[in-house]
Amino acid sequence: PFDDAGNIIFTRTWTDASEPKVDNQGNEIRPSQVEVYKWQSTFCKDDMGYIINPYQFYFEAGENTITMEGVNEPMVLKKLTLAAIDDSVTYEEYLANCPGEGNSETNINYVQVVQGEDSTIRSESSLYAKYDKSAPNTQPYSVTNTILNYVGGETWCSAGQWIEWEFSVPEDGYYNITVKGRQNYARGSVSSRTVYIDGEIPFEEMEEISFEYENDWNNLTLADADGNPYKIYLTEGTHTIRLEATLGGSGILLEELEDSIYRLNQIYRKLLVYTGATPDQYRDYNIDQVYPEVMEAM
């Protein structure tokens, strides 16, 4: 139906093969990565990350045909689901749809720290746990020994890469989420992540959270423009949180730039056929008459 639908990516999932081992010097040894064979539910969406929301397909009433052609690597397909388009909700609409009971003393005082290196699954085998000895505010920390204490870094830079963690809450209620991170790779720029709770983006403000350039580790509480922390409603039990790299607000600009470069290359090739690689400077090629559409496009 459109060009981008010709390249739909289905990511594999990876996890640690075992707990980190410790050598006789007290240094942790990073475990190898193994693929997790599990069913995944995923939308058909832009693999380049220019657009966060899933693709929308138009179907006529009655019987339609969907054909999927394998391009690279084997996979097993269990089912296809066609669903009505759900418009993303704002934070205010999200709160209005959640239960109105206030928090109890238990979940007001509840704190659970999930270390970054303890991620459950991830989209690529390169997103393994690493160590940082330069910052004493990392946990765990050791000056002398190699201790795995973070995940991501320079390998977590491409749109669509994600890391997922499990956590639990003691009872139903509203909870705040704080992410400890550091973005010291792109000076003058930001790194953006999309937040998924239990596989879904709870509200549109979670489509992009930004980490500005900073040499130090900082705590970023997910909050609105005024600094008020977002209240996330969770039921008692185990949940997942996934952070997925995204281009954020620059995605649309990059897509337009790529499209402009593509069209300029088309114009260049057309002119190259007409004038040759070394145009005669003493000849008038009358391009405006031969290729009026090129002049209009430029």
Language model feature labels by segment:
Residues P1-M298:
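Extracytoplasmic
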